[in-house]
Amino acid sequence: MGKLHDFTVKHNRFTQDIDIYVEGIIDDNQDLLNLNREQLKEEHKTAKDQFIIPKYSKAYAKKKGFSTPDLYVTGDMFKAMSIEAKGQQFTINSSVDYAPKLEDQYSSDIFGIAPSKQAKAKQITTDELGRQYKKIVYS
């Protein structure tokens, strides 16, 4: 068969398996995790684009230089973050033993990509999906 047929077969196979490729792109994607890290550490916001509450005590806020928590002390929680795709959704968490305590204190919304960062997340995944497509279909 010809090149067009080969291309069509590869294209159809890729589109048929698109969910598998998307999951592979999302799983442990550091660029996506960095969006969550940035919104926590730099913007002090949750996955709902809300400031993290409760606020720090006045004494600790004075020491940190801001009153809204950033959940960054040693960086261990940020380093231990992971992202995993599950169908049409993904889950972000951290494997540090105190992550559940932080979720109890500040809400499970500390993990996730906020609406204000969704466009960037989409761009990250779309760009990588395009690279995968070129690699697989045009090879």
Report residues per predicted region:
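Short, Lys/Arg-rich flexible segments
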Residues: 1-139
